[in-house]
Amino acid sequence: MSGIDPKRFGKVAVLFGGESAEREVSLTSGRLVLQGLRDAGIDAHLFDPAERPLSALKDEGFVRAFNALHGGYGENGQIQGALDFYGIRYTGSGVLGSALGLDKFRTKLVWQQTGVPTPPFETVLRGDDYAARATEIVAKLGLPLFVKPASEGSSVAVLKVKTADALPAALSEAATHDKIVIVEKSIEGGGEYTACIAGDLDLPLIKIVPAGEFYDYHAKYVADDTQYLIPCGLPAAQEAELKRIARRAFDVLGCTDWGRADFMLDAAGNAYFLEVNTAPGMTDHSLPPKAARSIGISYSELVVKVLSLTLND
């Protein structure tokens, strides 16, 4: 697909593993990315920052990195800043886009100021009076609600709350993962979708139909009964407009090159954006490979396309 001489990429590190709650997902993503790059003849090697200092990248002659780290320092701008310091080109967003993209609270603040629709929400801080805040939030947002740590990915510690009595415990649990907790009004009626972004590729939307209550960690990476509908079933004009809004949701955060934007539709077909992902999973359950495969792009071709974006000025 790319027609790029593999030698142009030089020595490539596939960053994987790390120390976040998403380490196991990242290990799987990294190994598959490595195979995809090597299948294309690229000189790629695994590199786990949890086991080796980043300075080794420069010492060992790496000139480029495919970031398959998920969550934590791999996705919050820290790795990106270090790679900038060492002069190593890397996939995905830079420091600002990565930091904002992993922070659901500040993502939503930016979207509110730039006209990107997002569900109504409240924030709770670790140590707040959870019972009192729960009463206030239910009165303001109603039920059901989603409770999530502000800076975890892969739906780690995300809980759906259907009763007011269950909310204080959900707040307490989420606060063990992050000092800021997002409580979001549940958008019902139209389903969950994702828009995958990879440079100028026109990837189709995916409708996600989990067997359980919502698309949680188990549905994303373990279960085989989650349905991924491609095509998504929406009229072509509506799909095109939603992809346009998704790209805007990505761009206003300073995100670049590739990632995902997730959103819900209500019963009237209105979109509400939930989050972006600047270092999407690349496992056999992950969404970007599914979207690419549906239009005839292999896994190897997709990872080469993503890596090729690091050749741009």
Swiss-Prot record:
Signal peptide extent: none
Keyword terms: ATP-binding, Cell shape, Cell wall biogenesis/degradation, Cytoplasm, Ligase, Magnesium, Manganese, Metal-binding, Nucleotide-binding, Peptidoglycan synthesis
Catalysed conversion reaction: 2 D-alanine + ATP = D-alanyl-D-alanine + ADP + phosphate + H(+)
Binding site for Mg(2+) 1: D262, E275
Domain ATP-grasp: 108-308
Enzyme Commission code: 6.3.2.4
Pathway: Cell wall biogenesis; peptidoglycan biosynthesis
GO CC term, one of those recorded: cytosol
Cofactor(s) needed by this chain: Mg(2+); Mn(2+)
Record text on cofactor binding: Binds 2 magnesium or manganese ions per subunit.
Molecular function terms, GO-annotated: ATP binding; D-alanine-D-alanine ligase activity; metal ion binding
GO biological process: cell wall organization; peptidoglycan biosynthetic process; regulation of cell shape
Compartments reported by the entry: Cytoplasm
Family to which this protein belongs: Belongs to the D-alanine--D-alanine ligase family.
HAMAP family per the UniProt record, alphabetical: Dala_Dala_lig
Entry protein name: D-alanine--D-alanine ligase
Annotated organism of origin: Burkholderia vietnamiensis (strain G4 / LMG 22486) (Burkholderia cepacia (strain R1808))
